From Swiss-Prot:
<feature type="binding site">
    <location>
        <position position="329"/>
    </location>
    <ligand>
        <name>Ca(2+)</name>
    </ligand>
</feature>
<feature type="binding site">
    <location>
        <position position="34"/>
    </location>
    <ligand>
        <name>Ca(2+)</name>
    </ligand>
</feature>
<feature type="active site">
    <location>
        <position position="134"/>
    </location>
</feature>
<feature type="binding site">
    <location>
        <position position="330"/>
    </location>
    <ligand>
        <name>Ca(2+)</name>
    </ligand>
</feature>
<keyword id="KW-0574">Periplasm</keyword>
<dbReference type="GO" id="GO:0046872">
    <property type="term" value="F:metal ion binding"/>
</dbReference>
<dbReference type="InterPro" id="IPR024607">
    <property type="entry name" value="Sulfatase_CS"/>
</dbReference>
<protein>
    <recommendedName>
        <fullName>Arylsulfatase</fullName>
        <ecNumber>3.1.6.1</ecNumber>
    </recommendedName>
</protein>
<dbReference type="InterPro" id="IPR000917">
    <property type="entry name" value="Sulfatase_N"/>
</dbReference>
<keyword id="KW-0479">Metal-binding</keyword>
<comment type="similarity">
    <text>Belongs to the sulfatase family.</text>
</comment>
<dbReference type="InterPro" id="IPR017850">
    <property type="entry name" value="Alkaline_phosphatase_core_sf"/>
</dbReference>
<feature type="signal peptide">
    <location>
        <begin position="1"/>
        <end position="20"/>
    </location>
</feature>
<feature type="binding site">
    <location>
        <position position="35"/>
    </location>
    <ligand>
        <name>Ca(2+)</name>
    </ligand>
</feature>
<feature type="active site" description="Nucleophile">
    <location>
        <position position="72"/>
    </location>
</feature>
<dbReference type="GO" id="GO:0004065">
    <property type="term" value="F:arylsulfatase activity"/>
</dbReference>
<dbReference type="GO" id="GO:0042597">
    <property type="term" value="C:periplasmic space"/>
</dbReference>
Amino acid sequence: MNKKAMAAAVSMILAGGAHAAQQERPNVIVIIADDMGYSDISPFGGEIPTPNLQAMAEQGMRMSQYYTSPMSAPARSMLLTGNSNQQAGMGGMWWYDSTIGKEGYELRLTDRVTTMAERFKDAGYNTLMAGKWHLGFVPGATPKDRGFNHAFAFMGGGTSHFNDAIPLGTVEAFHTYYTRDGERVSLPDDFYSSEAYARQMNSWIKATPKEQPVFAWLAFTAPHDPLQAPDEWIKRFKGQYEQGYAEVYRQRIARLKALGIIHDDTPLPHLELDKEWEALTPEQQKYTAKVMQVYAAMIANMDAQIGTLMETLKQTGRDKNTLLVFLTDNGANPAQGFYYESTPEFWKQFDNSYDNVGRKGSFVSYGPHWANVSNAPYANYHKTTSAQGGINTDFMISGPGITRHGKIDASTMAVYDVAPTLYEFAGIDPNKSLAKKPVLPMIGVSLSAISPAKYRSRRAELRG
């Protein structure tokens, strides 16, 4: 499809949405997966069963050329604002000597930008947030400060998925805590991240008056490491990955070709692995397969929680007038424990024995081999890199006005285009002044405005 045809097709996507917004304001729900690879879920060629996301894909459409940042916080800042991550204050992930005190690297959302939550709240929406925030914890940068009426937020970048809430490492400890509506909270004994986030979101949606539209931000921390899932979910994938990473990768490539996401004549990339699967000992193979088993369980469980959200929308009569967006913040993460700059003493607290992998008290990451599988068809490029495997991730949209059901569109879309697109669907003026002082205009454009004449180029910094 040439660029002119792409632009025409994408304009058709929004034609119904703009009309619907004039009649009845749609609910808008943004669902985010954390560190998930391009081909992990079934709509993008994955073997992990994700029936609810598959249903969303069949009732809506997929964008195969959606681009984001190679790192979490910068991506989330662009998604929530429609601005660049530097404009939003998230120019990088950490404080470096060269960026301390520099505008654009405050590492928190600044007042130079307006968030979707602020604009939807101004339009009368009940604005709800559950899950990972990672956009600042100081006054003026928290979810409550940035437009959410209610927020159950994990404030940091990553943590245990159970109630022990152990940080990713010593470097993450300062913002490893949860808040509900701005107040720190402890976690119940039965806490598991994906289930808790969805449960809270469902409760708030059910409590919202039927006549009031909802803007919801459901930001899962799955499948970010540490890889952990409830036992019953891990058991579902027993033995599935004992064939090894190279074979699973080849199978994903075949399904990507069958879907038309990559061409039939695309050569299979060479996986530059430290050890081929066959070179591993039987014990190493068994352990490695178990780690991927846990990763798959996390994604399947996340999909089930999305299913509870869809059921809530039906129960509350919102399912026919809700725009659903699903996306991933960045590509799969190849890193292992050392990445989080923790001391040997930190790692002594974990039991990573085979039987305990994936349970509370363990901390495992799946490393570069399985990350290559997750990022198929992109070999050896991943989170932290500004190559395809780090920045070309999943995007799906369904709901009123989305008429190309089941289609996979190859139009180019960027993370900062999401906010203006959703504003157009909801009939919200993105230029209305909400702040006491002027804010920067968005750099993103609505999907309906993308055309060859409006070609834009932006480059991400490494780890930003």
